[in-house]
Amino acid sequence: LRAIDPRNAYLMDSMLRDVTIYGTAARASSTLKRRDLAGKTGTTNEHVDAWFCGYQQTVVACSWIGFDQPRNLGSGETGGTAALPTWISYMAKVLKDVPESFLPAPEGVVAVASPSSSGKGPAEELFYQENAPAELEPEPPVDHSIKPED
């Protein structure tokens, strides 16, 4: 029994990994020196709650910062500033000797080069094969289990 199309799982994993590499949780990958982390930051209205939920292929963890009786945490307290450091500290311990692990790309997913004017952000964008813009010459996604040359 499969809950969702493997292509959806792969695309979501890719988007959530981008959060920990280029987005509001980029400190996770840079601090832990891993590319296989994924997650989502969150901050409620009026900065009452801050959270980060993230995972690696072998472990999932969430960090929530707030008060039992809701009140403002402070204007600078967000998921990326208040909750993420706790998550990073926990994951540093549980992933200490765990090698990086990535979902393999399923059949039917292709990548196209991602033009970026800033040089920041993902080098490729993923598509269902049948929805890829043909003029951008789709090809198989990058195998993230292969470490780039230093």
Regions found by a protein language model. Give the residues of each.
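A conserved catalytic-loop motif detector
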Residues: L1-T41, N45
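Soluble, non-transmembrane domains of envelope/secretory-pathway proteins that act on or interact
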Residues: S30-D150
